[in-house]
Each structure stands twice: as structure tokens, then as C-alpha cells.
């Protein structure tokens, strides 16, 4: 029997999960009762917390959670001890044993998380559409939070439509609640609260750029009328979405230059202006929902801590180090990029800890699952995630969230999802052992080969991720001009135009990746040869791996092209290098046409077009004649028109908030 004391909905769900899964792996149907009269598994829970214990006793086995959610984790821990595995969402990520007789473990244990908060950020409608499987996986992986990252107006290329959440929340909120997961909502919505349509009659509400007021970015947070508008529309947002425990209403997503320079804002850094707006929203939230919080985002031009203002008690710090290096842990002292971000995190934590910190503060927003940052193919990062979790824990971070986004749905979920969930709970685990556990669940007939394939891919990607400060300085917002051939956008991995010797050294390091990829392909051949019923699932996972390998090859060829141009190579040599880079890009396009579903393909190819602009930029600068430049731009305009023939993409690019 399963004996459950109490009527918490989360505890009841835990009991049902235990009953159902035990039966699936070979146990008899066990009734759930309030008081057992014979051998039983007893389920108990306290007032709150994620820790749990498992203890054999004279009547069977006791599972006790610090709170109802801790009890649910105790159930999943017991099921894992019996051989159950959930390494990815959905049926392909589940592996359940089949026992003739289920024997309960005789050893006891006690466990609790190193980080109080461990969150999955659902950051695109692709993933919101399959959120049921992600929510179930998150609970089984001992994550504590689901954050639905949304956008109101503008293209939703890296977030869910707020209207999509409204369409889905009736189905998803009960699933999140029955598992005891916290729910967070929002994104770059701050400008939505001061609508641009007000500019015509009230230009003073909007930022002063040094010469005039403009409605292009953010607003003037110091103007009393702006603050009044924030209060009214902030209250409306909080009231419209009462299901959230944390609200994220962030400034515009840009590298810098989006805040106000009027006399009222004189002396306020970008960080202070952002915190001023957030504090106003926190005051409103305190009146409506004293139990909820609103986040302050330290990101890009607000990474450095505010100098003038202090946070409201209901403001939670969330630090987002997107431009960091993912070749090393965030606290690696020898890495000149990450050392800066570790210092900025520390100064933000110091500011927030001087006040009475909000319950989830300080927290970090990480990018281990970001298909936009990593160009639609996330590299495996076991050692980096492990090092990060240790550093974040030791720095006093209470919660780490990982952004799940991209320009297409995955064929199979990235390995980093499994690694992040496990390491956020217990950072001291050996990353190599975790990879082995994953491989044993995914490819039980060839686990060593699958582990080698991922180790090879990680080694191949390392030099692509190990940027220098000179390379990191090359980023450029999109769009930067009307002529994207002359000034194409540059993101974190677009460092090919760095000055010598950085570009030369990067090319030399990148070329070594080809040998690692060859080793990985050999390992994958062994995995596929051993596959049986899991063949289609493993083939999908390999397709994702191959995309990562092909993407890396393109980065090598692009780097080679730019280095040769910098060496002033002859035109024939440059044309050959351009042809090689174009062929590598064409491989990515062919992969997309075969594997990206039609509903997402145009958006994916639109972002792939940025790679084409990088090649065109070099050709325009070094190879084509003046009269050919117009023809080059005409071809790219024709490509854009072909993509825009897809009405779904046109709608996405033109639609505004519903």
C-alpha cells in the first residue's frame, strides 16, 4: 500500500505518480490510503522546502519531503533508484525498466538542493506548444520553476507570444500547480507599459537622446506622467496574469543606448533608470500581491550595479551574462571575459543584500539551451555548467534559470537540459559520470560510444567558444542599417573580423575541430549500429549532433575567408575560400529543408540569412566590381521576398500585441 497523510494536491499527485509508475515497471496495483494496515510506502511532508529523505522502517519505507514538492522529489528519487530514467522530455526521453519483482531499496538517504531555485525558461511558441512534456520532465528532474518568457509587440523570434500564453494557460497552469512548481511570467515588456502611441501627444514621457525626445527605445523613467502610466498599466498586467509568482517586466533588449538623457535623468546610469522603473512596479505589486515579486534585469548596459538607487523589497535581482564565454566557468579567474561578469554579479549581489532581499534573490538567467545564441545548435557544456553551478552557489545565488529558446523546435532535446537540471541540484557531481548516466539511458547497448560522441563534439566546439576580449567587442545590434551587406549584424559567435593576431589564432584553433568531429562520427556509427526499437529516436538525436558539427564547419570556413582577406590574398584564392564557405552554408540550408517543420522553416532561414550577409559583406568589400554590388543586393532582396512569401513569417514580423 501507499500511505499518504495530508491532502496537499501536490502530495496527492506524488502518491499517484508513485502508484502509476510502480505498476508500469512491474509492481502490483497499490492502493493509496490514509492509514495502511500492512506493509506500505509511507508518504509524509512538512510545511515547505525541496529537501527529502528516504528511510526503511519496520513497516516498509518512509518518504518524507520538507514540503509537498520535496515529497514529489522523494518519489522520483525512489523511482530512479528502481531504474527509471527521464533524461529528456517526452516518451523518447523516458526509459523504464521491467522487473519481475520490484524490490524497494534498503539504504536510506537524505538530500536537498544546493540552489533553492532551479528554473526552466520556456522561450518560444515552439516549446510552449509542447510544454506539457517539458513541465513533466522539469518536475521529474527536480527543477522548481517554470518561467514562460513572453513578448507583447514585435517579432517573437526568441520568446513566446503573450497571446500564446493566454491561449495555453488554462491547460498548463493546473499541470504546473499539481507538481508544486513555481510559475514566472514575462520578458522585455517594460516599454509595453508606456505605449508608443502616447508619443504624439506626450513626447516628454519618452527618452531624450541628447537632441530630442524619441519613442524608439524605453522611455523617460523620471517624468511623473511616465511613472503614473507605469503604475496604471503595471497594475493592469499584474491583474491580468494572477497565476504568476514572479513577474518579469524588463527594458528593451539591446546592447546599449536606449535610456534617457534629460535633466530629470541626469546622474542616473542605465541601471539606475531601469531600477527606478522596476521599483515603481514593485510598489504597485506590493499593494496588489504582497506575496509576489518583480524582477530587475542586470543585462547588457545594466550589468553593472545601480549607483544611486536601492531596490524595493519585492524586487528580485536576475543577472543575465549572455556575452560571457561558454568555454569556461563563470568564475574562471584566468578568463578575462568571465572574470568581468563574475565581478559584476558580485557587485549586484552586494547591493541587493544590503537591503532586505526578495525571496528568490539573487538569481541568474543562463543560456545553456539558447538556440539563438548558439546559432540553432547548442553545444554540450558539461564541465562549464558544473563549474558555473559551484561558482553561483558559492557567490550566494539562490536561483539559476536556463533559457530554452530557438528558431525551430528540436528533433531531440539538447543534452544540456539534463546536465543543467542535475548539476543545479548537486553541483559537486562529476560531469563525466552524468554524461555516462545519460548515455546509458539513451543508448543502453552502446553507452560508451554515445558518451564519446558528445565528448568529441564538446572538444570540437571549445575553441569556437573561447573568445578573447577583442573578439567579444565586435557585437552589433540587428538591424544596424538599411544595408545589411555593408554592416551585417554580429552576435556572440560572429568574431571573424577581429584584428590580427586574434583572427589568425582563432582559425588555427578552429581547424583542430575537424579531427574531433571525425572521431565523434565514428562513435555515432557504433551507436546507430547497436540501435533497435530506439533507432528513430537516436537518429533524430544524431541529426542534431550533425547539425552542430556542420555549423562548426561553417564557422571554420567563414573564419578562413576573413583571415585570407585580412592577409590580402589574391582574388582567385579569396573566391575559392568564399566558395568553400558558401558550400558549408548550403549544407546548413539543406539540413533545414529536411528537418525544420514548415511552420518554423521561414523564420529559421531568415536567421540563417545573417550568415549569408557575412559572406556577402566580404565579397562586396573584396571581390565584386562596383556595378556588381547592386546585383548582389538584388539577389538578397529576392531571397527575402521568397521567404516573405510564407504568410506565417509575414504575420510574425508585422503583428503587434493583441
Give the predicted meaning of each segment.
Residues 147, 184, 248-250, 318, ...:
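Conserved beta-strand positions in the central sheet of alpha/beta enzyme cores
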Residues 40-44, 120-123, 146-147, 293-300, ...:
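Short, hydrophobic beta-strand segments that form beta-sheet elements in well-ordered domains
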Amino acid at each position: 500500500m501507499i500511505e499518504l497523510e495530508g491532502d496537499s494536491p501536490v502530495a496527492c499527485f506524488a502518491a499517484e505518480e508513485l502508484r502509476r509508475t510502480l505498476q508500469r515497471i512491474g509492481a502490483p496495483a497499490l492502493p493509496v490510503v490514509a492509514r495502511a494496515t500492512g506493509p506500505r510506502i509511507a508518504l509524509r511532508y512538512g510545511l515547505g522546502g525541496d529537501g527529502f529523505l528516504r528511510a526503511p522502517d519496520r513497516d516498509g519505507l518512509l518518504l518524507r519531503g520538507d514540503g509537498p514538492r520535496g515529497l514529489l522529489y522523494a518519489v522520483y528519487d525512489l523511482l530512479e533508484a528502481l531504474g527509471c530514467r527521464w533524461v529528456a522530455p517526452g516518451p523518447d526521453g523516458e526509459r523504464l525498466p521491467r522487473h519481475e519483482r520490484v524490490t524497494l531499496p534498503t539504504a536510506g538517504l537524505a538530500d536537498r538542493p544546493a540552489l533553492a531555485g532551479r528554473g526552466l525558461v520556456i522561450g518560444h511558441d515552439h516549446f510552449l506548444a509542447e510544454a506539457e512534456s517539458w513541465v513533466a520532465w522539469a518536475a521529474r528532474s527536480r527543477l522548481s520553476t517554470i518561467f514562460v518568457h513572453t513578448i507583447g509587440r514585435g517579432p517573437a523570434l526568441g520568446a513566446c507570444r503573450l497571446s500564446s500564453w493566454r491561449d495555453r494557460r488554462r491547460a498548463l497552469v493546473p499541470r504546473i500547480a499539481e507538481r508544486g512548481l513555481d510559475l514566472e511570467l514575462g520578458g522585455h515588456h517594460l516599454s509595453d507599459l508606456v505605449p508608443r502611441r502616447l508619443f504624439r501627444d506626450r513626447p516628454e514621457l519618452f527618452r531624450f537622446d541628447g537632441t530630442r525626445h524619441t519613442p524608439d527605445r524605453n522611455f523617460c523613467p523620471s517624468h511623473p506622467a511616465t511613472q503614473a502610466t507605469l503604475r496604471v498599466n503595471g497594475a493592469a498586467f499584474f491583474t491580468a496574469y494572477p497565476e504568476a509568482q514572479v513577474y518579469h517586466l524588463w527594458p528593451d533588449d539591446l546592447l546599449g543606448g536606449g535610456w534617457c538623457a534629460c535633466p530629470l535623468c541626469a546622474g542616473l546610469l542605465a541601471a539606475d533608470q531601469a531600477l527606478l522603473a522596476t521599483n515603481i512596479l514593485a510598489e504597485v505589486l506590493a499593494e496588489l500581491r504582497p506575496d509576489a515579486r518583480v524582477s530587475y534585469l542586470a543585462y547588457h548596459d545594466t550589468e553593472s550595479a545601480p549607483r544611486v538607487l536601492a531596490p524595493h523589497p519585492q524586487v528580485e535581482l536576475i543577472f543575465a551574462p549572455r556575452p560571457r564565454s561558454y568555454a569556461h566557468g563563470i568564475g574562471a579567474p584566468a578568463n578575462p571575459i568571465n572574470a568581468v561578469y563574475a565581478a559584476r554579479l558580485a557587485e549586484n549581489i552586494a547591493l541587493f543584500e544590503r537591503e532586505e532581499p526578495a525571496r528568490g534573490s539573487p538569481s541568474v538567467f543562463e543560456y545553456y539551451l539558447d538556440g539563438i545564441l548558439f546559432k540553432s545548435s547548442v553545444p554540450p557544456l558539461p564541465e562549464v555548467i558544473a563549474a558555473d553551478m559551484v561558482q553561483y552557489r558559492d557567490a550566494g545565488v539562490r536561483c539559476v534559470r536556463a533559457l530554452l529558446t530557438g528558431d525551430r523546435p528540436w528533433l531531440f532535446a539538447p543534452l544540456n537540459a539534463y546536465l543543467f537540471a542535475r548539476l543545479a541540484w548537486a553541483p559537486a557531481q562529476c560531469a563525466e559520470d552524468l554524461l555516462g548516466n545519460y548515455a546509458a539511458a539513451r543508448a543502453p547497448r552502446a553507452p560508451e560510444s554515445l558518451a564519446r560522441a558528445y565528448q568529441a563534439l564538446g572538444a570540437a566546439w571549445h575553441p569556437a567558444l573561447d573568445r578573447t576580449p577583442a573578439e567579444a567587442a565586435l557585437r552589433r545590434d540587428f538591424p544596424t542599417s538599411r544595408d545589411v551587406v555593408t554592416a551585417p549584424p554580429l552576435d556572440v559567435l560572429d568574431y571573424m573580423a577581429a584584428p590580427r593576431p586574434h583572427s589568425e589564432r582563432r582559425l588555427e584553433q578552429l581547424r583542430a575541430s575537424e579531427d574531433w568531429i571525425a572521431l565523434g562520427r565514428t562513435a555515432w556509427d557504433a551507436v546507430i549500429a547497436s540501435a533497435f526499437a530506439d533507432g528513430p529516436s537516436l537518429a533524430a538525436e544524431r541529426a542534431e549532433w550533425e547539425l552542430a558539427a556542420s555549423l562548426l564547419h561553417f564557422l571554420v570556413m567563414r573564419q578562413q575567408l576573413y583571415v585570407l582577406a585580412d592577409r590580402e590574398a589574391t582574388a582567385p584564392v579569396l573566391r575559392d575560400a568564399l566558395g568553400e564557405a558558401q558550400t558549408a552554408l548550403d549544407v546548413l540550408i539543406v539540413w533545414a529543408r529536411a528537418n525544420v517543420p514548415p511552420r518554423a522553416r521561414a523564420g529559421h532561414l531568415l536567421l540563417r540569412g545573417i550568415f549569408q550577409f557575412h559572406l556577402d559583406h566580404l565579397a562586396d568589400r573584396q571581390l565584386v566590381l562596383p556595378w556588381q554590388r547592386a546585383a548582389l543586393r538584388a539577389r538578397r532582396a529576392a531571397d527575402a521576398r521568397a521567404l516573405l512569401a510564407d504568410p506565417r513569417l509575414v504575420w510574425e514580423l508585422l503583428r503587434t500585441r493583441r
